[in-house]
A protein has these predicted regions:
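Short, basic/aromatic beta-hairpin or loop at an interaction surface
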Residues: 1-3, 142-152
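Extracellular LysM carbohydrate-binding repeats and other cell-envelope/extracellular binding modules
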Residues: 2-39, 180
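Gly/Pro-biased beta-strand-loop elements
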Residues: 30-142, 166, 194, 200-282
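Short beta-strand-centered segments at strand-helix junctions
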Residues: 151-165
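N-terminal targeting pre-sequences for secretion and organelle import
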Residues: 162-205
Length: 283
């Protein structure tokens, strides 16, 4: 899970120092964005990547998902359909002139090339897109995953990009979308989740209403007339927690839905430091 996913889902919890006995909601139920279900699909509003692996010999497709970091305000990750054109292990970072200029003006000059190693913002693996200058890559600052900190590239946790790098071949299609509002059927429950829209766009509330209407029309066989609790929809959208909740009238309210989630006790300690100023953001 990424930083924003955790903080939005747990607004009253210090994610880095939650305290002994704190109950933390892990938002691990994801609604798939509307996009072709082949190759890579990146929803920048949810800061999440999906990989639809090729069908196996039984005609089954395995879906993988990982949190991502995306471009900051002013350096937004571009939307659209592209493809993987090249793969590189232990890549050097050829710093774009625009980024070198920005850092020089801030009194923090960068070299023309950052060699592979622990100081390289690209991490140990990179997938080059057909969009000139843009990569899907690892990072030497994992705490930035789930934040808007890059110059437009997509960053993953080191362990996530390592596994993705092995699975994704050159030529794989990549669909980059911005869909803060998501809806889909989970059995006989119509689920809805809302993420905070990107600052530049502000989201499209009418599109959310139209999406829910389409999902109602596509109700699974055997599901009776569907009545939507529109007040609940509006509240979920307003809060923007990124957590999927049922929205039919009479279905469990969000608090009851959360209370029914299984509790898991863990003594694990986070390996990543809290995010600091990103002094060397990647391209």
């Amino acid at each position: 899970l990424g930083y924003e996913e955790m903080t939005r889902a747990n607004p009253d919890v210090d994610i880095w120092l939650p305290g002994a006995g704190a109950v933390v909601l892990l938002p691990t139920q994801f609604i798939l964005p509307e996009a072709p279900r082949d190759g890579l699909v990146l929803n920048v509003a949810a800061m999440r990547l999906y990989y639809y692996a090729p069908e196996d010999q039984d005609g089954q497709t395995t879906l993988y998902t990982h949190p991502i970091g995306i471009g900051r305000v002013g350096w937004a990750t571009p939307l659209g359909t592209t493809r993987i054109t090249a793969k590189a292990a232990n890549p050097a970072w050829y710093v774009p002139e625009s980024i070198r200029k920005e850092h020089a003006e801030a009194g923090d000059p960068l070299p023309a090339v950052v060699p592979p190693g622990p100081d390289n913002p690209l991490g140990a693996h990179a997938l080059r897109l057909a969009m000139p200058g843009y990569l899907i890559h690892g990072t030497n600052k994992p705490a930035g995953v789930g934040l808007r900190v890059s110059h437009g590239c997509i960053r993953l946790y080191p362990e996530d990009i390592a596994s993705l790098y092995e699975m994704v071949p050159k030529g794989t299609p990549v669909h980059i979308v911005e869909q803060p509002y998501l809806a889909g059927w989970h059995g006989d429950r119509l689920m809805f989740s809302a993420h905070v829209p990107l600052e530049e766009t502000g989201g499209d509330w009418l599109a959310a209403l139209e999406l829910i209407d389409r999902r109602v029309q596509d109700a699974p066989e055997g599901v009776g007339p569907v009545e939507i609790d529109w007040r609940r929809v509006a509240r979920i959208a307003r809060e923007g927690k990124g957590v999927a909740y049922p929205i039919e009238a009479g279905s469990p309210v969000p608090a009851a839905w959360r209370a029914a989630s299984p509790l898991v006790r863990t003594e694990a300690v986070a390996n990543y430091r809290p995010p600091e100023d990103e002094d060397v953001p990647e391209g």
